[in-house]
């Protein structure tokens, strides 16, 4: 084996016929061993010898097939499309009606005019005016308690100097 010439690449060995020559030599050697072991009755038990050579090409790798998805005629695709609702383009009036319905369900009022953020500032008294009872008793004012200051007076309605 030391006197064998080793090719630089398997492509060069295949082109020059070196691989075929080595394969034929190994087959001849294995046939001679079979004949010699078959004629001699010394070894009653025969053993199989598997010769693997790195210079021989290995078995081809398993092929991977990339399959396409079935068209819309497939049973899986059509059932998935039937269960999913189709997106509908709604008009502005439909969207506003749904919004008002959801708002009424959640907040209890259908119009956004009832919110304190959107009230005009004219309902509120000017900053420097005195505190009146009518402001506390207004129907829109839902104050549970008025905070008291450190000296027992009403804290937020006390005028600063």
Swiss-Prot record:
Residues 1-17 have a biased composition (Acidic residues). Residues 18-35, 93-104, 116-126 have a biased composition (Basic and acidic residues). Residues 70-91 have a biased composition (Polar residues). Keywords: Phosphoprotein. Residues 116-160 form the SUZ-C domain. Residues 42-111 form the SUZ domain. It comes from the Eukaryota. Residues 1-161 are annotated as: Disordered. Pfam families: SUZ, SUZ-C. The modification Phosphoserine is found at residue 125. Belongs to the SZRD1 family. This is SUZ RNA-binding domain-containing. The gene is szrd1.
């Amino acid at each position: 084996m030391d006197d064998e010439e080793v090719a630089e690449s398997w492509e060069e060995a295949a082109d020059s016929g070196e691989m075929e020559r080595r394969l034929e030599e190994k087959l001849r050697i294995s046939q001679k061993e079979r004949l010699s072991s078959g004629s001699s009755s010394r070894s009653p038990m025969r053993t199989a010898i598997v010769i693997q050579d790195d210079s021989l090409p290995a078995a081809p790798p398993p092929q991977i097939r990339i399959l396409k998805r079935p068209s819309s005629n497939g049973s899986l695709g059509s059932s998935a499309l039937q269960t999913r609702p189709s997106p509908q383009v709604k008009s502005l009036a439909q969207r506003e009606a749904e919004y008002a319905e959801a708002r009424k369900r959640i907040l209890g009022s259908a119009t956004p005019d009832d919110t304190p953020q959107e009230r005009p500032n004219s309902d509120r008294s000017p900053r420097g005016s005195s505190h009146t009872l009518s402001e506390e008793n207004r129907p829109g004012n839902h104050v549970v308690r008025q905070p008291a200051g450190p000296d027992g007076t009403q804290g937020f309605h006390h005028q600063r100097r």
